[in-house]
Amino acid sequence: MQTDIFDVVIVGSGASGGTLASHLARRGVKVAIVEGGPRVNTRTDFNTHAMPFDFPTRQVPTMRPGKVGFDSERSRGVGGKTMLLNAVALRLSQRDFKGRTFEGAGEDWPIGYKDIAPYYDTIEREVGVCGNRDGLEDLPDGIFLPPVPLKCSDEILRRAARSLGGQVIHVRKATLTVPTKTRLACHFCGNCMAGCDVVAKYNSADVHIAPAEQSGRVTV
């Protein structure tokens, strides 16, 4: 029996696994991804526009202490949790890395924001992150697509916040507001945590793993 030889084996095909496999494949590395679930088609396998009572599956039992409420959405399949995440994509700031310096609590990381900023740039270009450059110290600006338009209720909230000296900004999400060759732009259906049938929202299966498989250097 012939045995395939791989340079790297990655366990899990979510955001980390998919991104790593994609970048290794571009550098000529032969990669195997070990995934415990099936392949999922985000366009057809989710009841994206259905109500919860229309779902054919039952809730997965979870261990809960007493009556403490805990909601956990899980995904086992190619793409992992990226199939269900809401895709809010915020950069950590220098304050996050240097908690003791700024807040007097915790420990400072041995790296700072400037060390990983170039990697934020790279991944934002790859997956497509929408938002505004708001110039906030705690939420560093990135490489953004145009933001998702505010709803009427958002405008009301923003006016109220301004009257109190606060600020409301557009959400920063790994969601396309401008179409690409392989993905459509968001049409604001509000079901980001149920697949995304136009792949406007990032998922590692479509954005990273599928192209990597087409290169012939990645096997799931």
Task: Annotate the PLM regions.
Residues 11, 33-34, 169-171, 220:
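General beta-strand structural signal in soluble alpha/beta enzymes
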Residues 102-219:
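Conserved redox-cofactor binding core of oxidoreductases
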Residues 1-114, 118-121:
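N-terminal glycine-rich phosphate/pyrophosphate-binding loop and immediately adjacent elements
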